[in-house]
Amino acid sequence: MRRDFVYNNNAMFNPLTTHYSSDMNWALNNHQEEEEEPRRIEISDSESLENLKSSDFYQLGGGGALNSSEKPRKIDFWRSGLMGFAKMQQQQQLQHSVAVKMNNNNNNDLMGNKKGSTFIQEHRALLPKALILWIIIVGFISSGIYQWMDDANKIRREEVLVSMCDQRARMLQDQFSVSVNHVHALAILVSTFHYHKNPSAIDQETFAEYTARTAFERPLLSGVAYAEKVVNFEREMFERQHNWVIKTMDRGEPSPVRDEYAPVIFSQDSVSYLESLDMMSGEEDRENILRARETGKAVLTSPFRLLETHHLGVVLTFPVYKSSLPENPTVEERIAATAGYLGGAFDVESLVENLLGQLAGNQAIVVHVYDITNASDPLVMYGNQDEEADRSLSHESKLDFGDPFRKHKMICRYHQKAPIPLNVLTTVPLFFAIGFLVGYILYGAAMHIVKVEDDFHEMQELKVRAEAADVAKSQFLATVSHEIRTPMNGILGMLAMLLDTELSSTQRDYAQTAQVCGKALIALINEVLDRAKIEAGKLELESVPFDIRSILDDVLSLFSEESRNKSIELAVFVSDKVPEIVKGDSGRFRQIIINLVGNSVKFTEKGHIFVKVHLAEQSKDESEPKNALNGGVSEEMIVVSKQSSYNTLSGYEAADGRNSWDSFKHLVSEEQSLSEFDISSNVRLMVSIEDTGIGIPLVAQGRVFMPFMQADSSTSRNYGGTGIGLSISKCLVELMRGQINFISRPHIGSTFWFTAVLEKCDKCSAINHMKKPNVEHLPSTFKGMKAIVVDAKPVRAAVTRYHMKRLGINVDVVTSLKTAVVAAAAFERNGSPLPTKPQLDMILVEKDSWISTEDNDSEIRLLNSRTNGNVHHKSPKLALFATNITNSEFDRAKSAGFADTVIMKPLRASMIGACLQQVLELRKTRQQHPEGSSPATLKSLLTGKKILVVDDNIVNRRVAAGALKKFGAEVVCAESGQVALGLLQIPHTFDACFMDIQMPQMDGFEATRQIRMMEKETKEKTNLEWHLPILAMTADVIHATYEECLKSGMDGYVSKPFEEENLYKSVAKSFKPNPISPSS
């Protein structure tokens, strides 16, 4: 048997992505003649793949893929990797088609066998029936489209009705309100000129003339009249004075004896018949009048027929007071001050008719107005109930006529039912005709499909081979990751155990250097495997609560030492609008930030690196960069500015001007305008990372996000890196439903930004029931303290204020030490000797502001002398902010009066708090956390626990046992799944089991399933609940996923090599913290 590898020099094969070019496919199938004869390498079963030359693998990888200086190293790597993988495949007897395992004769036979009858050829007789079925389906779809368009037309028709009805209701209310205001003004006029003038300036003739001449202001009123309040004992004198008798409204007879009357004394000529009639003689009228004077507001009657027009109308009544009322009068004060009542009659029917006559489309709808004060018996105010209308559709609009006691509404309907729209009549037949034609076209195309069926089979074969190659690639990556990470786990574990022993400084330095290198190698492997998982579509994001600000502070701490060594400003700012806790994949979010900040630190030698986080909608118009590389800047336009200082974080020019103070101050000023009614469950963040580094050449900007690509060949030599971080970051951002882009100017710097959609997480209860979020608990001892920050750079000062604000410190920013002296002196003058009053607690000075001039030391001494002279308060402490500081500068700062502690950058809230506790000589108190949120240490979780470690590798067993014993656990080791089953026979005394997944004979999944089966059988027999927490241990980062572990019955997952944080997250779910003695 022979295995033939057929390839040509133009074929492209990438062991990581397994992409075949068209040349390779045709060469594999020997289907077409090439200009150059493909080279055949024949290997028999007895031969080894090791006999392949490096040049053969170089040609397999593509002749032009490698530079001459890089060929030997990269060729040997892939050669050894592929040969090693082939040897493993031979040993495991796995049959995967990584390359074509057939010769030319077999290829020709296969191509000949594929030429047979196809599905369409075999079922040609069914094609007419299929066409008829197609026409029926098109008919059903056409009817569905008709129904959909008809429903849409009904919705639009309803929207128009709603708009027209609401418009009429608003206009009716507005016109009614105008008339009510005029009646109110007339009531005030009567009160002023009839009761406040002596003698009265109003009589019947004056009132009638005035109301007649101002009737144009009250077009909706048929008339107005004024009735005076008359009590019973004043009735006789009142009747003699007016020379008429008070009469009832219904019959015109003398009014019977009552406690109080309201006879009309003034009236408009149109309602002169109301003179002498008692407005309180009717029961409902009496109630309305009493309600008006008690509330001081206008009241309405129920609808009734007006005497002259016989139209439906209502009477509006206003109280008239004879004296001025207090600001908030009581009901008794209103009644006592009442002098009379001004009433106006509204002709509702005429009002609505006039309104509808002014509007377009009046004939299209039917309008009814109701009084629904009594909901069970609504009263018709306007409209004919028997009028013909489309009763299938109606809209109701509420009416407010100013009387809260009475309720009104307007109901609108169309006069006629909706006709079938023209677009429906044309679209549906057109769609049916098109569908019918499509059916005939498909029927004719069926014969053509028969002719291309052979090509389809050919492509199907290529697809099968590509899938087989993808399986081989996945297994290759899984095996390589396991085989590399397993010994690396042993190396890093042993180094960690070595560092726990007594070592000399030189030995410790060697061990720590080896540990750092090992972790760097693991990080590189993880990046390559992440890229592979992304290409395979197997990378998924988790959703857990986490604290963005804590994540960013942690990232800054990773690069703090390097930024100090380079004397560059490294800072972060998070908008107050960004929620404190969000839900998402904290690890992947952190990975993106680390990649971007790491690149900035790597390529920046001076200036600053500024990380800013805010809501993408917060400044959408001005903050979102243009969706183009470099913001559309051409190479001819890039000129390095000669300006010496810029309003940026460090004063150096940046590629993107949005983080300068002119733009940044608008973002800061909007911090307090957080909307409370945003009900969206998601939050869209924008994160920008600005640096003043070397920038990216224009010619390289198009390939920045391509994997394994860098600006040029010198980048890797000078700065290191693989060029894979940005491509992974781009994929992760897209998984977070965001986008990433950048603006870069050579020799100026770069600004990368990305957006990410995360979930809001406002309830602490949701956090407690999930994986513990990465939340930083800051000290609360600084709340209410006051500080002055001296910094001439406004952006940097705003960042400092942000971190101080997180600690609860109120900050005032000044630009110079002279201003600080003035501010401290003003504070001293305005201060209070009472200890409970606020005082100035600290003055924090930026190093740049201190060393900028020689006179600043004298200003510091003056500041100390002024503040120390206040006997009522402790003098504020002076502290210095610095990115780095020399010994001479430190000695000078101490002699000038600064505290011994210098707050080193990059600033983080926790670090500032720790330094200020030293500066202010505060006693460090244990943080008080909400119940259940205080993080337990691994020692408190594992002390006294008996744990079984199952692993076939003796080094891994020693590493795992050493790591667990370090935290007080009692460890027993087993070398296989069978031994573990023997030790875990119920009853046993183990508290947990750490189970390796890939073991010979019985893997960890099978061992776990059998353990769970034993526990289930024990429960069925003895009714005793047994559940041993089992945590998976594996170096295989592709197959050993969290879901697979849960499916087999495991409780958690720990990836090799062990990290203390990951170990804690896993065991914290199964164990509760034990109290441990302080000595331990």
Curated annotation (Swiss-Prot):
| pH dependence per the entry | Optimum pH to bind cytokinin is about 7-8.5 at 0 degrees Celsius.
Q: What does the UniProt record note about how this protein's activity is regulated?
A: Activated by cytokinins to initiate phosphorelay signaling. This cytokinin-mediated activation is repressed by the trans-zeatin antagonists 6-(2-hydroxy-3-methylbenzylamino)purine (PI-55) and 6-(2,5-dihydroxybenzylamino)purine (LGR-991).
A Pfam family reported for this protein in Swiss-Prot or TrEMBL:
CHASE
Q: How does activity depend on temperature?
A: Cytokinin-binding is more stable at 0 degrees Celsius than at 20 and 37 degrees Celsius.
Documented effect of changing L307A: Loss of activity
The record's SUPFAM superfamilies line, in alphabetical order, gives: ATPase domain of HSP90 chaperone/DNA topoisomerase II/histidine kinase, CheY-like, Homodimeric domain of signal transducing histidine kinase
Q: Where is the CHASE domain?
A: 198-411
Effect on the protein upon substituting S765N: In strain: cv. Se-0
- Positions of transmembrane segments: 125-145, 430-450
Q: Where is the Response regulatory domain?
A: 786-920, 946-1071
Q: What does the UniProt function comment say about this protein?
A: Cytokinins (CK) receptor related to bacterial two-component regulators. Also binds the synthetic urea-type cytokinin thidiazuron, a potent defoliant and herbicide. Functions as a histidine kinase and transmits the stress signal to a downstream MAPK cascade. This protein undergoes an ATP-dependent autophosphorylation at a conserved histidine residue in the kinase core, and a phosphoryl group is then transferred to a conserved aspartate residue in the receiver domain.
What is this protein identified as? Histidine kinase 4
Q: Which organism is it from?
A: Arabidopsis thaliana
What taxonomic classification does the UniProt entry list for its organism? Eukaryota, Viridiplantae, Streptophyta, Embryophyta, Tracheophyta
